[in-house]
Amino acid sequence: MGAAALKPEGQTERPATSATPDVDVAIVGAGLSGIGMAAHMQMMCPGSSYVILERREQIGGTWDLFRYPGIRSDSDMHTLGFIFEPWKHEKSIADGPAILEYLNRIADERGIRPHIRFGTKVLSADWDSARALWTVKTEDEAGTRRSVTARLLYLGSGYYDYDTPHDAQFAGREDFRGTIIHPQFWPSHLDYAGKRVVVIGSGATAVTIVPSMTHKAAHVTMLQRTPTWYAIRPARDALANALRRILPEKVAYAITRFKNVRLQNLVFKRARSQPEKVKDYLTKKIKAALGDKYDAKTFTPPYDPWDQRLCLVPDADMFEAIKAGKADIVTDHIDRFDATGIQLKSGRHLDADVIITATGLRLTMGGKIALSLDGVPMNFADHFYYKGCMFSNVPNLVAVFGYLNASWTLRADLISDYACRLLNTMKAKGAHVATPVLAADHGLVEDNVFDFSSGYLQRALTIMPKSAAALPWRLNQDYVYDKAWMKASPIEDGILALGRAQPAAQAQPQLEAAE
């Protein structure tokens, strides 16, 4: 199994009429999703070829991009880790470097690294019906453009816009004499020792940064518009570490993973069915952690738990910093920045030397790649999800969008397994094309693709694929159900049409009729 070299733009190794691609699968992204797909291919499709196209110079994706203080997982590594590779560290809530080490070790031990083309940004991908393949065009840092053809395009590029975060605009920003930083572009040599820091935001990024910066900063203030629900849990999983001492690594990992998956699922469903009970539980934990520092106004959100993702606070580290007087949380609205800090609408002023704008991320679908079908631009928002990874009337395209109520990698594992079974079925049947077919008069009841109120998700609704009320045409948010259903659901389910290459003149009327 090998990976093709990328060809200079305009150069082809085969005639333009050939239906033989350079590789079976072009994987976009060398983060969790991409490395996971490569590993699954080597286990399940050893006769198939692939290439990983990665715009950065390192493995890791999100975990290589974000470098702010304390960067860590917001899920336990027994579920954020892959199903096939045990997590061996003592801490189950892992920091960024440990996650990078995990990914790099997998890439090296499994021989994945030689298949990665680093410094390669994917610009576009066009599906050619006549040849039944994708032509993927790329550009390196020197501006050299190349292309590669693939039977299947696998988008493991995550959902963050790496170039443009959601950076809220504040009046008077240019007046501030200190340093303003967005966490997505953290400077490597920032010196904040002895300085007053204000972190704007109360999401996972802010909750991570605040306690981490208190070790050097004079004081750190989290400035929030509205409170967030926090979940306190130990950074180390006592059961996992006990099992590792008495059982084989893979067995201990599987037991812990099963336990954590079921617990995640139970908590989410309980939050939706009995929100008051979950509120009481979370509040009691926060009160116990803060003691007399607890303030109901600061820690009582105007929404139910899991209407937005819970923010994890490992070992109650942020609350320990607040108790120690090294950090505090202010609930207010910003009027404007000034020379020495932030003027709030309440009239209060926050003095600051450094302001961190942890105001959110901008979501993107498919890594902002210009996708087209026989030269006609494709818009994800015009298509329904199929089995949470393919799209109505779009051939040979698989994309990963992880769970919102559980670890990202849980869905990535399911999708990699499905994609490999799809590849094997296509090869066994002599098929070149796999298309989830949806008739124009489908009658599907459309549902909200995100059943969450988080701002970063709501801002992205216009670019997201559609999600129906019923399977298989939806992005489901229940891993336990999905795992059983995806395994039991056959590839040839009466919806996914398998076929061979056909001229575009024949393919286009079929697509138009389906749409």
Where are the model-predicted features located?
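Beta1-alpha1 glycine-rich phosphate/pyrophosphate-binding loop at the start
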Residues: G2-A3, T20-I116, Q224-R225, A288-D292
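C-terminal catalytic lobe of FAD-dependent flavoproteins
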Residues: Q274, Y281-A370, E446-E515
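Rossmann-like dinucleotide-binding core of oxidoreductases
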Residues: P15-D22, A26-I27, L32, M37, ...
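Core beta-strand elements of the Rossmann-like FAD/NAD(P) dinucleotide-binding domain
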Residues: V23, A142-L152, A193, K345-V354
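Feature captures the FAD/FMN-dependent oxidoreductase FAD-binding
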Residues: E90-D161, A289, R336
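Short FAD-binding loop at a beta-strand-to-alpha-helix junction that anchors the flavin cofactor
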Residues: L80-F82, I180, G388-N405
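Short beta-strand to alpha-helix junction loop
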Residues: W87-R105, R117, I200, R270-V278, ...
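C-terminal, flexible cofactor-proximal segment of oxidoreductases
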Residues: G2-L6, A206, T228-I232, N241, ...
